[in-house]
């Protein structure tokens, strides 16, 4: 018996449907983080001291300027986000240091070391703290940085004032004056980093600098 073969003429051959893999879009939060990461990298680069334009930033991120403004309404908001990141990071590390160390002198030592290490490892953010990255930006950003240093100084004041309660010893100098000096030391080191284009590692000489501070705790 010969099997009848069906003719395929005039019949379309249907190829199996192949699903195109979907490319997951980044969330707004992820895009915002990407923009900030690229901005930090640009601030750290050789052109980090130049005026930061949205055109340059958009090109590095790989989006249009219009798309950039979907994630941040203005360049000022981008820098504000960076300053908030610096503030939250350093203050949380200070809090952690306070949990790990109870002796006031050691607390101050560890906190100063933490701050200088952060500045050394994050040149782009250090340029924000010194104001060099903000020279062509809105004046409110300089005020925001000043607010950060005020909060840092208050942290030092609180730690120093707790010494009398925790250790039964007071300072011969007003705690606010000492705190102001500690913040000035940090700001000076930040400026030194930027001035030398981060060639000098000031944290290597921190222990020598600490010798001038240590007598305050005697």
From Swiss-Prot:
Biological processes per GO annotation: cell division; negative regulation of division septum assembly; regulation of DNA-templated transcription
MF term (GO), any: DNA-binding transcription factor activity
Gene Ontology CC annotations of this record: bacterial nucleoid; cytoplasm
Highest taxon, organism lineage: Bacteria
Quaternary assembly: Homodimer. Interacts with FtsZ.
DNA-binding region: 53-72
Family designation: Belongs to the nucleoid occlusion factor SlmA family.
SUPFAM superfamilies: Homeodomain-like (SSF46689), Tetracyclin repressor-like, C-terminal domain (SSF48498)
Compartment list: Cytoplasm, Nucleoid
Function: Required for nucleoid occlusion (NO) phenomenon, which prevents Z-ring formation and cell division over the nucleoid. Acts as a DNA-associated cell division inhibitor that binds simultaneously chromosomal DNA and FtsZ, and disrupts the assembly of FtsZ polymers. SlmA-DNA-binding sequences (SBS) are dispersed on non-Ter regions of the chromosome, preventing FtsZ polymerization at these regions.
UniProt-recorded name of the protein: Nucleoid occlusion factor SlmA
Name of encoding gene: slmA
InterPro entries the record matches: DNA-bd_HTH_TetR-type_CS (IPR023772), Homeodomain-like_sf (IPR009057), HTH-type_Tx_Regulator (IPR050624), HTH_TetR (IPR001647), NO_SlmA (IPR023769), SlmA-like_C (IPR054580), Tet_transcr_reg_TetR-rel_C_sf (IPR036271)
Biological source species: Haemophilus influenzae (strain ATCC 51907 / DSM 11121 / KW20 / Rd)
HTH tetR-type domain segment(s): 30-90
Keywords carried by this UniProt record: Cell cycle, Cell division, Cytoplasm, DNA-binding
């Amino acid at each position: 018996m010969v099997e009848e073969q069906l003719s395929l003429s005039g019949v379309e051959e249907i190829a199996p449907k192949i699903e195109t893999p979907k490319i997951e879009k980044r969330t707004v939060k992820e895009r915002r983080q990407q923009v900030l990461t690229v901005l930090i990298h640009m601030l750290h680069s050789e052109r980090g001291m130049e005026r930061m334009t949205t055109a340059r930033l958009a090109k590095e991120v790989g989006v249009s300027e219009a798309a950039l403004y979907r994630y941040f309404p203005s360049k000022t908001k981008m820098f504000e986000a960076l300053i908030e990141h610096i503030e939250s990071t350093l203050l949380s590390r200070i809090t952690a240091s306070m949990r790990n160390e109870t002796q006031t002198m050691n607390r101050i030592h560890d906190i100063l070391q933490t701050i200088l290490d952060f500045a050394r490892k994050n040149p782009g953010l250090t340029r924000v703290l010194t104001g060099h990255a903000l020279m062509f930006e809105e004046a409110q950003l300089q005020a925001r940085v000043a607010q950060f240093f005020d909060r840092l100084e208050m942290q030092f004041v609180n730690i120093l004032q707790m010494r009398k309660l925790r250790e039964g010893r007071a300072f011969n100098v007003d705690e606010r004056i000492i705190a102001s000096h500690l913040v000035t030391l940090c700001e000076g080191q930040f400026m030194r980093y930027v001035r030398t284009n981060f060639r000098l590692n000031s944290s290597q000489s921190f222990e020598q600098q600490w010798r001038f501070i240590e007598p305050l705790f005697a």
